[in-house]
Amino acid sequence: MSTHKAARDPEAATAVEAAGDPDAAPDRHRTDPRPTPLLVLDVVGLTPRLLDHMPHLKSLARAGSHAPLETVLPAVTCAAQSTFLTGTHPAEHGIVGNGWYFRDLGDVLLWRQHNGLVAGDKLWDAARRAHPGYTVANIFWWYAMGADTDITVTPRPIYYSDGRKEPDCYTRPPALHDELTAKFGTFPLFHFWGPGADLVSSRWIIDATRHIISTRHPDLTLCYLPHLDYDLQRFGPDDPRSLKAAADLDRALAPLLDDARAEGRTVVALSEYGITRVSRPVDINRALRRAGLLEVHTQDGMEYLDPMASRAFAVADHQIAHIYVRRPEDLEATRDALAGLPGIGQLLDDEGKKTHHLDHPRSGELVAVAEPDAWFTYYYWLDDARAPDFAQLVEIHRKPGYDPVELFMDPRDPYVKVKAATALARKKIGLRYRMAVVPLDPSPIRGSHGRLPASDDDGPLLICSTPRAVGDRVAATDVKALLLRLAGLG
């Protein structure tokens, strides 16, 4: 019998001790049960309105309990998930968005993966203090790499030396990679983000989660399901295609919910934010450039943001933008440049950031919050002919801000499908290729998030299979304590 199993199973631990000591007798009065196993589903974009189109999750809510979830500012994936897992605000854990300006590097970086960026006591640390040997599987929640979890599955493309990018994932333990790939195929990265993003990626994640639960039985399983993020941003939350996406995801989830029920798992389904209808893109960096505050450098006719030389620039992240101002004397000029820009609802200074628990050194000197029907582009060039070549690619790591237009193929290019087919043909024979199909026009976007919700119906939600587990509302900072309590460790 392994000592790892003994650490998880009190009766096994007693047997190990007795085997090592012939005079020892089993302690039949031990009351140290295994924690209640949990399945925590991050159903991106889930709101009370969408729940009406998701009968399996609605049934779970009806039989158990549910409440509006009070999210954090910014209401984006990395910040919200970090709050769920640490019980603290961005001001404490330091995840001020899906990316930020790394001042020491002079570079804007989004979608980093190292858990070391998240400060604070993690959920699994607290669980293991209460129950040594507590096991955790993180399946696609962010900042997974380097986390002290037992099982990890997270997206990780193969970047070949010739510039090619191919789908894949990272796992821990490493042998799990080939096990999942043999059973379910290569992780479908190009269905996870980009013009081809659809249910295929969430189905793969669901299949991987079911396999890990049935073969490893972790005490806590975290599962991230991105499907609602796609069509709700493309078409808006009330479009029939978005409502169909909700029904499709609910149907795909049913076998996983059945597995959890059969194993006696408590299920928690929650969301980080609700996606609301938008129609106004706000070119915040172009306003700063026209004011002479943002600088670019040019190579081969293409303009690149120069964050180290700029007096001020913005890192756009959905409906939030961190504005980095190099010198205090430029703060007033930066405010003036943005004061009349349509679409900005609030411009948070030091006091405003403190009010919203966003006062962290990684935050911008100012933080812009969009009006309800607006969102921020990252665009900084003034002429599309001078845009960098990566602007028309799915390049989440090279763009100095979030670009939801990557969900589309350029509708104005009559040859866009021919270009895509040619690039795909080059890829299949092992040649380098450029899938330059993303439009430079932001107007197709119909859904966004990042602001605090105006109403509960449009905000995130928490569902628990346990009756009376939650009260009238749940704060994002209380999710960690709630999960510990549901596990019997609170």
PLM regions with names:
Residues 421-438, 443-455, 460-490:
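C-terminal substrate/ligand-recognition segments
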Residues 49-92, 135-137:
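Short, structured active-site-proximal loop/turn typified by the sulfatase FGly-forming signature C/S-X-P-X-R
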Residues 3, 11, 17, 23-26, ...:
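His/Asp/Glu-rich, glycine-adjacent segments
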Residues 50-53, 148-150, 233-234, 278-282:
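A short acidic (Asp/Glu
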Residues 2-7, 21-68:
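Active-site-proximal N-terminal segment of extracellular/periplasmic enzymes that hydrolyze or transfer
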Residues 32-33, 212-217, 449-456:
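Short glycine/proline-enriched loop/turn "hinge" motifs that connect secondary-structure elements
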Residues 34, 43, 75-76, 100-116, ...:
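Secreted, luminal/periplasmic, and some membrane-associated catalytic domains
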Residues 33-49, 60, 84, 127, ...:
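Beta-strand elements within well-structured catalytic alpha/beta cores of enzymes
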